[in-house]
Design a protein with these regions (language model features):
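Intrinsically disordered, low-complexity regulatory regions of eukaryotic proteins
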Residues: 1-108, 112
Length: 113
């Protein structure tokens, strides 16, 4: 196992996250940051369909990788388990918000009609 690439972090990178080069803590922080950015981006409901598909793919991919990491047999402290669960909730909420925004502003509908 290698060390986390985050500045100043000496934690080891689990096998499932080696391609990311991040420890579990920094991986979850990165997901949370990206989700916050995407949530702001999609809040208006005017996100292009292609971008919506990218976000849905991101949510699924990150969720799958996080699940694989969390269930790999590592002995994790309770605080890190809670952080992982919170990150799953963040991913789920982003997807739900994307769906809700799309319902409020269906693609192809224009203002003033």
């Amino acid at each position: 196992m290698s060390s986390c690439s985050a500045s100043g972090c000496k934690a080891t990178v689990p096998v499932a996250l080696e391609a990311e080069k991040l420890c579990i803590l920094h991986f979850t922080m990165e997901i949370e940051r990206h989700c916050a950015e995407m949530r702001r981006e999609t809040a208006t409901g005017r996100t292009a369909r292609e971008r919506q598909v990218e976000i849905i793919t991101y949510v699924g991919g990150r969720g799958e990788l996080l699940a694989r990491t969390a269930t790999s047999g590592l002995h994790l402290p309770d605080e890190l388990k809670a952080r992982i669960l919170n990150t799953f909730l963040t991913l789920m909420n982003l997807r739900e918000n994307l769906d809700r925004a799309a319902l409020r502003h269906p693609i192809g509908r224009t203002e003033g009609r």
